[in-house]
UniProtKB/Swiss-Prot annotation:
The lineage of its organism: Eukaryota, Fungi, Dikarya, Basidiomycota, Ustilaginomycotina. It is found in: Mitochondrion inner membrane. This is ATP synthase protein 8. It is a single-pass membrane protein. F-type ATPases have 2 components, CF(1) - the catalytic core - and CF(0) - the membrane proton channel. CF(1) has five subunits: alpha(3), beta(3), gamma(1), delta(1), epsilon(1). CF(0) has three main subunits: a, b and c. The gene is ATP8. Coiled coil: none annotated. GO terms for molecular function: proton transmembrane transporter activity. Mitochondrial membrane ATP synthase (F(1)F(0) ATP synthase or Complex V) produces ATP from ADP in the presence of a proton gradient across the membrane which is generated by electron transport complexes of the respiratory chain. F-type ATPases consist of two structural domains, F(1) - containing the extramembraneous catalytic core and F(0) - containing the membrane proton channel, linked together by a central stalk and a peripheral stalk. During catalysis, ATP synthesis in the catalytic domain of F(1) is coupled via a rotary mechanism of the central stalk subunits to proton translocation. Keywords: ATP synthesis, CF(0), Hydrogen ion transport, Ion transport, Membrane, Mitochondrion, Mitochondrion inner membrane, Transmembrane, Transmembrane helix, Transport.
Amino acid sequence: MPQLLPFYFVNQISFAFLGLFVLLFVFSKYILPAFVELFVSRMYITKL
């Protein structure tokens, strides 16, 4: 039963943290600035 081996949990935790870090990096670098730019442009358009 591989679920009882300790390195199985270490492997799962390390890949979970790696995936979380990659997801956080991609969101903060590429996806979220586009939304910020969109909201800022909407705000400028409504203030005109």
